[in-house]
């Protein structure tokens, strides 16, 4: 029910506004998103909205990011969408590992801070920033027109090599 979902999100926004500091509101927002959305690969598309992710309670990185952005902005906290890559393995210096396309949030708290709501952590050296924007539509990793068979798919493979520590 859309009305109930809107009422629930409005209640979450009020919880954020009730915090003493922006840092507390940002931390609470991350917790709220993690508590209400579960990671489910392939459960959504790039056109899935934050409202749809809230309603289904599942999504992928861009859904976690859009959900967090919608709450933060509704609470008056500036935030932006970040597109990039994430490598999830520790590797030796100079060793190449596979990375994954990924999305996370940057939020203004006296300076821009990166938060990864999908993995419930601060953005660090495992995150490789490619672009920033208002939402996914501003910074898709690939954009264009394809003409061909209807059954075609697209895959992304990323290799990351850390050169310095």
Regions found by a protein language model. Give the residues of each.
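Secondary-structure boundary elements
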Residues: 1-59, 67, 75, 136, ...
């Amino acid at each position: 029910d859309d009305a109930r979902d809107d009422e629930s999100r409005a209640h979450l926004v009020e919880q954020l506004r009730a915090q003493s500091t922006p840092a507390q509101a940002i931390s609470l927002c991350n917790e709220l998103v993690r508590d209400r959305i579960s990671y489910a690969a392939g459960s959504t598309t790039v056109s899935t909205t934050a409202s749809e992710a809230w309603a289904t309670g599942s999504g992928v990185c861009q859904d976690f990011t859009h959900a967090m952005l919608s709450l933060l902005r509704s609470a008056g906290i500036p935030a932006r969408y970040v597109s990039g890559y994430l490598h999830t393995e520790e590797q030796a210096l100079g060793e190449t590992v596979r990375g994954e396309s990924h999305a996370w949030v940057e939020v203004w708290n006296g300076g821009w801070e990166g938060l990864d709501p999908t993995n419930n952590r601060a953005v660090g050296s495992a995150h490789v920033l490619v672009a920033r924007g208002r939402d996914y539509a501003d910074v898709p990793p690939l954009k264009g027109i394809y003409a061909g068979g209807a059954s075609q798919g697209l895959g992304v493979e990323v290799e990351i090599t850390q050169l310095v520590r």
